């Protein structure tokens, strides 16, 4: 009989079972792939091991077991539209997997282990299991007969690519076999491979891929020298089997999440609301895990996919009638369910909560306007009809409605969207953006990059221990072309830069936030100034050079020397960045994630995830803590160690960085519990002791995106330089005001007080100049019938004074229309006042509308006081005549 296990128990049981049979447990990788730029998100267990598929001998372990976080929402693998409406679609899911790298005879053993796990460990009824194999894979069919005792009726041969996996047009490939669970005849559907296979009765619960071939070209396939096996089982699907349910949303995890949603929204998960609850529960998982792995909501890339997911859920919350943000209140319930295994959820809880609340608040401000437009444009559409793609694009462009959100809203009314029109609008917008971008590379440059990728050479970096070294010039590149030499006599007056690549170098190539070294390369024939060093493809150091004298030839032997003072400042700022990172985590919390950094010669910039601005007091506390670590003069130690060991010891790794099995770990200081104060994986250069940094000073803190703060700071001699400049500035100020440094503030306070008094007096003076009495009116007004018109042009007046003067004048004097034009910096403001006793005939706001029709601009107001703002125009010269005509009619 099948044993009931909750989802956490299944995950643990799976991992422990395969560990018992020689598998190394590898933690789930980040959802942001570090080794595959073609993927938005990790969508399968094999992704983090792709390099081992290509080169199995590089894997430290021959067998691995994982539970991998996956997201399918965007690009080729996009389940977003179906989520909530089917039994098994998710944006976020967990993939159980076990893998073999380079074992020649693991096939039978893997099949036996998987069958035993399902039938003997989980006690799944084997009579409910059937398998599929690729139609020519007789070996696997034979093994299923011997291992599981399956007869041919339960071994289904499939001819389609569903049962043959490949990495691409060329590369590793092989047949796969799938295990299906029969949910019984109460569920409609036929066997895999039949026309009714999509009915749902038979659900795939495990896929086993045997990578035993290599596709060389379209027609040639050969045996792989080293075979691999990739298996995957959806955790949610396994849970349905063990918990006796058919629908993934009925397993314990989702039942608990949906119960929380019911509690907060006060709406039961029945009828149409059931779809909403399922969407919210699924998208909550995806949003929280993406944020925990460093993705921030934005308008492009991964951040936009996250925003789409969040807004789709938030719209469902709105549809349930919730007026206030709700999604962030569900985070604690999710952490209660999944936070013990995925500790990053607990660490990033504050950030996840803040971003969900902030996004929902922002979205609510535009949601009602967008829904109003959508309702207006679709009110006459009937079931089966189509909304214009232009309207869908306007909703996207103006109100932040992702396409699939509009699609989701209309789905309930069986209305579709003209996707072709939407895509055309999107394409036109992208083309306009491209036309504004002036940095496109030439075809020649593109060809160079392609050739570099094909022929790149790894540069041996010797700069950790040496400041000088000999090297052989292996490439010279100028004007996007390979050249044999660079000659000072053939260089034009601009002395164009060129690229120089050597077999080894002491020059650090820009990476990990640290900018590249500068220095000199020379031999008996030439002297070259290195203005920068970059690193391509993760291993090729490219020196950006200008020739000073002589001629440099390909294959020449050169002496290379970095600028030691420049390197020292880079080391100082890099080590200071590590200490700053540790201080931020210590004082603000472990939710802090590094989002970017720049380590320069004269300053550092550090971007981190943090929900709110950092107060001045906290910045002072952080700065003091960094300086305290510096003054302790503790050792900065380098350790070369296995990646897993470094992570186990608490090393901080960047989410999007790709690490090898061996890593450089930089430790700084120790805490009372014998842990390092700072412990990070880092390929940069550092000081030997924190005292070498000297001092640290934060210059600024600001927001650069939702939930991302930027800190700029200086260290070392630059702190001393700034302190000296500040002191000299104080001396100048004290001298200017004939006071001591100690009394500068009281002097400034006195000046501010005096300035405020003078401002007040000036305002009163200008007000007195504008306020008019009956006698003034008689002398300066134009009489238009019984109406008196006062018309004035002024410059550089505070508009508040003008409004007050016009309002008070028209209140005190009857039958008056007062018009004042204030001109400031090519902009004009027109203030119009009308006496209350004539507003039955003339209204200030109506005069404004008529004037705007003539001169442009915008404005409004009341019957007695109104205002127009516009760019200065020559039409203003005739404005008095226009107003006279309006008053005369």
UniProtKB/Swiss-Prot annotation:
Its cofactor is Zn(2+). Binds 1 zinc ion per subunit. Pfam families: DHHA1, tRNA-synt_2c, tRNA_SAD. It is found in: Cytoplasm. Its EC number is 6.1.1.7. GO terms for cellular component: cytosol. CDD domains: AlaRS_core (cd00673). InterPro entries: aa-tRNA-synth_II/BPL/LPL, Ala-tRNA-lgiase_IIc, Ala-tRNA-ligase_IIc_anticod-bd, Ala-tRNA-synth_IIc_core, Ala-tRNA-synth_IIc_N, Ala-tRNA_ligase, Ala_tRNA_ligase_euk/bac, DHHA1_dom. PROSITE patterns: AA_TRNA_LIGASE_II_ALA (PS50860). Gene3D superfamilies: 2.40.30.130, 3.10.310.40, 3.30.54.20, Bira Bifunctional Protein, Domain 2, Threonyl-trna Synthetase, Chain A, domain 2. GO terms for biological process: alanyl-tRNA aminoacylation; negative regulation of DNA-templated transcription. Keywords: Aminoacyl-tRNA synthetase, ATP-binding, Cytoplasm, Ligase, Metal-binding, Nucleotide-binding, Protein biosynthesis, RNA-binding, tRNA-binding, Zinc. Zn(2+) binds at residues 574, 578, 682, 686. It catalyses: tRNA(Ala) + L-alanine + ATP = L-alanyl-tRNA(Ala) + AMP + diphosphate. Catalyzes the attachment of alanine to tRNA(Ala) in a two-step reaction: alanine is first activated by ATP to form Ala-AMP and then transferred to the acceptor end of tRNA(Ala). Also edits incorrectly charged Ser-tRNA(Ala) and Gly-tRNA(Ala) via its editing domain. Belongs to the class-II aminoacyl-tRNA synthetase family. HAMAP family: Ala_tRNA_synth_B (MF_00036_B). This is Alanine--tRNA ligase. The lineage of its organism: Bacteria, Pseudomonadati, Pseudomonadota, Alphaproteobacteria, Rickettsiales. The gene is alaS.
